[in-house]
């Protein structure tokens, strides 16, 4: 009985082997036709003058020109000048002013983690772009003001 079932299985396998390539061929042709149709739909039929005259080199040149104009505009109008130099001294008069705004103060803050100066407040003075105008309490009382005129 096992021999008969093996023969039947082998006959069925042979039969399916013959019909299977034909089905594969039909499926493959249908898929190719679908792909060709989709590609035709995606192709430009009338791209217009902007796409037809497209040149990547001139586009890149125009982009560079626009970027340089934009950078020039922003660099001159909105450039914030530094108030302190690299060692933490005021650039306008080379004064070594403490952030407490007292002229004769030798430094009343903890040492700065960046420059080790006792004259830096919560933020290091080296290359800083702003100055303290005044020291004011929560009640609004002014304790000290900037002793120098610092230009913008």
From Swiss-Prot:
Pfam families: ARF7EP_C
Region (Disordered): 1-21
Disulfide partners: none
InterPro entries for this protein: ARF7EP_C, ARL14_effector
PANTHER family, per database record: ADP RIBOSYLATION FACTOR LIKE GTPASE 14 EFFECTOR PROTEIN LIKE, ARL14 EFFECTOR PROTEIN-LIKE
This protein's name: ARL14 effector protein-like
Organism: Homo sapiens
Underlying gene: ARL14EPL
